[in-house]
UniProtKB/Swiss-Prot annotation:
Record's function text: Catalyzes the oxidation of either pyridoxine 5'-phosphate (PNP) or pyridoxamine 5'-phosphate (PMP) into pyridoxal 5'-phosphate (PLP).
Protein's UniProt name: Pyridoxine/pyridoxamine 5'-phosphate oxidase
Gene it is expressed from: pdxH
Stated family: Belongs to the pyridoxamine 5'-phosphate oxidase family.
Annotated metabolic or biological route of this protein: Cofactor metabolism; pyridoxal 5'-phosphate salvage; pyridoxal 5'-phosphate from pyridoxamine 5'-phosphate: step 1/1; Cofactor metabolism; pyridoxal 5'-phosphate salvage; pyridoxal 5'-phosphate from pyridoxine 5'-phosphate: step 1/1
Cofactor binding annotation: Binds 1 FMN per subunit.
Cofactor: FMN
Reactions it catalyzes: pyridoxamine 5'-phosphate + O2 + H2O = pyridoxal 5'-phosphate + H2O2 + NH4(+); pyridoxine 5'-phosphate + O2 = pyridoxal 5'-phosphate + H2O2
Length: 213
């Protein structure tokens, strides 16, 4: 390890998170923080790390983009035959994490994952730029390929086949994580950070608790 890595430190002093000023509903708290991240013009505030676990118990992570958020859960779109798609098919639970560095904030979300409806996937697919729609056909995501030329050739082939109106591939669509646990982290001075955890109760409400940093 480079000797200077261990010496990198930062004092977190931009904000605070307390029970009196946080929402009782975690979705409302998340939407408030997401709105602030958007207004701050952070780079890709919609980016989130998705963690899944394979049938062999090996975890994996990757960055995906949130495409929807409501009382039903958090939505993103992907290739169902990718590694994450196959892992979610075998073990339909996942964790998401947003890290808004400039705001010194992290949000973690856990829950069960399901596919969104075909209607939802079709609507979002149609909203994408043409190149992105063709790319969903051209890329055999997570498979080994000989070179980038394979992707370029595939894109040209599907472009000639579908022209300006490619249908949604049957292997491509959305997932929705239905949260049963949220955690909000706000960096604080002296490493005495604020952490609030929301756990869904059998009644449908949420238990809010403070965790030690």
């Amino acid at each position: 390890m480079r000797p200077d890595i261990a010496d990198l430190r930062k004092s977190y002093e931009q904000g605070e998170l307390d029970e009196a000023h946080s929402a009782a509903d975690p979705l409302q708290q998340f939407e408030q923080w997401l709105d602030q991240a958007l207004k701050a013009k952070l780079p890709e505030p919609n980016a989130m790390t998705l963690a899944t676990v394979g049938a062999d118990g090996r975890p994996s992570t990757r960055v995906v983009l949130i495409k929807g958020c409501d009382a039903r859960g958090i939505v993103w779109y992907t290739n169902y035959e990718s590694r994450k798609g196959r892992e979610l098919a075998a073990h339909p639970f996942a964790a998401l994490q947003f890290h808004w560095v400039d705001l010194e904030r992290v949000v973690r979300i856990e829950g069960r994952v399901e596919k969104v409806s075909d209607t939802e996937s079709d609507a979002y697919y149609r909203s994408r730029p043409l190149d992105s729609r063709l790319g969903a056909w051209a890329s055999p995501q997570s498979q080994v390929i000989a070179s980038r030329a394979v992707l370029v050739a595939n894109a040209a082939k599907v472009g000639a086949q579908f022209l300006l109106n490619p249908p949604r591939p049957p292997h491509w669509g959305g997932f929705r994580l239905r949260p049963d646990r949220w955690e909000f982290w706000q960096g604080r001075k002296s490493r005495l950070h604020d952490r609030l955890r929301y756990t869904q109760q059998p009644t449908g409400g949420w238990l809010r608790e403070r965790l030690a940093p």
